[in-house]
Regions:
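Long, contiguous binding/interaction regions
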Residues: 1-89
Length: 89
């Protein structure tokens, strides 16, 4: 399948109560790993302080139906909000 480098699909995943949701989120990201080109995880944490919320940014590739499926499954996890969009030049 040819890839149009002028079109990118990006998903943002906001996770509240990371320790509670992390296992299920990781399971889904592993399940859909073939559709994730880039993954960046961000949270506030240093030393003794570690934030309960986190942000995951994904660059998705290939099957758009799988992107929607992943988004829907992530949104079904309590404390998780996911949205994706296409960016075009």
């Amino acid at each position: 399948m040819a890839t149009d480098l002028n079109i990118r699909t990006v998903m943002a995943v906001l996770v509240d109560k990371r320790e509670k949701a992390a296992v299920e989120v990781q399971k889904l990201l592993t399940e859909y790993g073939c559709y994730i080109k880039t993954r960046l995880g961000l949270h506030d944490g240093a030393g003794q302080y570690c934030s309960e919320t986190g942000l995951i940014i994904l660059e998705l590739v290939d099957d758009e139906a799988k992107h929607k499926e992943l988004c829907d499954k992530l949104n079904a996890v309590e404390g998780v909000s996911a949205k994706y969009m296409k960016l075009e030049l």
